[in-house]
């Protein structure tokens, strides 16, 4: 399986009159390729491996983001499942971080996300997810944990409960900007 796409958010398109659109200066391209293994074996019903890539540009032609991810999924014989996703972001520039200033470049980032879940066809099921991402220069990281439980008393009704915890310390926070000798400067903490 494969998919690809192109997203264009033009600065000329006036959607921000209501104030919801943070950035309209964006051109995004993405590509996903997935291989599926549909023939059951002794231990799984189906599995898949995938690769994804996307880039983001602004309307000045600057490459602002480059991201690659590798993912896999296994549906076991008992219909439980396990997933893994690894992400590599060698380039992260954000135009809006300095609030009107130049682009801000974050350091390279790598992450891994794992999940496992019980059979969703059963009346009760549970899913557990863990994620960890770390910037190369140790200025950003996050760790996330979540668990969800489902109960389906009838075919027409399903009840779910999910709780999660996320810790995302950032050593790069915008404080303010100023001007000295006609040169703009930005203060980060």
Where are these regions (language model features)?
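Exposed, low-structure sequence patches enriched in small/polar residues
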Residues: 1-189
């Amino acid at each position: 399986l494969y998919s690809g796409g192109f997203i264009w958010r033009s600065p000329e398109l006036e959607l921000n009159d209501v104030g919801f659109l943070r950035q309209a200066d964006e051109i995004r391209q993405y590509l996903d390729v997935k291989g599926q293994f549909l023939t059951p074996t002794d231990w799984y019903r189906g599995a898949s491996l995938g690769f994804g890539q996307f880039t983001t540009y602004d309307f000045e032609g600057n490459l602002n983001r480059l991201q690659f991810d590798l993912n896999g999924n296994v549906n076991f014989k008992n219909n439980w499942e396990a997933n893994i996703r690894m992400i590599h972001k060698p380039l992260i520039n954000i135009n809006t971080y300095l609030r009107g200033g130049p682009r801000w470049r974050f350091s390279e980032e790598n992450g891994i996300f794992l999940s496992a879940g019980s059979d969703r066809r059963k009346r009760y099921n549970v899913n557990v997810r863990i994620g960890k991402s770390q910037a190369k220069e140790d200025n950003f990281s996050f760790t996330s944990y979540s668990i969800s439980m489902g109960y389906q008393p009838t075919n027409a009704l399903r009840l779910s409960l999910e709780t999660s915890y996320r810790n995302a310390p950032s050593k790069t926070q915008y404080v303010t900007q100023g001007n000295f000798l006609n040169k703009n400067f930005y203060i980060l903490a």
